[in-house]
From Swiss-Prot:
Organism: Buchnera aphidicola subsp. Acyrthosiphon pisum (strain APS)
Lineage: Bacteria, Pseudomonadati, Pseudomonadota, Gammaproteobacteria, Enterobacterales
InterPro entries: Glutaredoxin (IPR002109), GRX_PICOT-like (IPR033658), Monothiol_GRX (IPR014434), Monothiol_GRX-rel (IPR004480), Thioredoxin-like_sf (IPR036249)
Source taxon at top rank: Bacteria
Subunit structure: Homodimer.
This protein's encoding gene: grxD
Protein's name according to its UniProt entry: Glutaredoxin 4
């Protein structure tokens, strides 16, 4: 399986997925910490990939996503963005609304 295939599978298999530095319990950068805090505030479970333990994904995901930085939040197969977008969406209520909409979609 190529790295692009692995990334695609991770995104398909997880409704809410964040590619981050570190883990939700121990983020390794301030941006990842803020992004995880925003997601946690929304109250739904999410999956994560620690790019520090996956150097192949760390090097290839920016090409796959056409997004150069981390963290990267993916919801329902769509790239939402990085830390600043996540925080902006949290502040204006869009993040929770999107997460609830996607969760409802898969509860049938």
């Amino acid at each position: 399986m190529s790295i692009f295939q692995k990334i695609k599978k991770q995104i398909q298999d997880n409704i809410i997925l964040i590619y981050m530095k570190g883990t939700p319990e121990a983020p390794s950068c301030g941006f990842s910490a803020q992004a995880v805090q925003a997601l946690s505030f929304c109250g739904e479970k999410f999956a994560y990939v620690n790019i520090l333990e996956n150097p192949d994904i760390r090097s290839e995901l920016p090409k796959y996503a056409n997004w150069p930085t981390f963290p990267q939040l993916w919801i329902d197969g769509e790239l939402i963005g990085g830390c600043s977008i996540i925080l902006e969406m949290l502040e204006n209520g869009e993040l929770k609304k999107l997460i609830l909409k996607v969760k409802k979609k898969y509860q049938t």
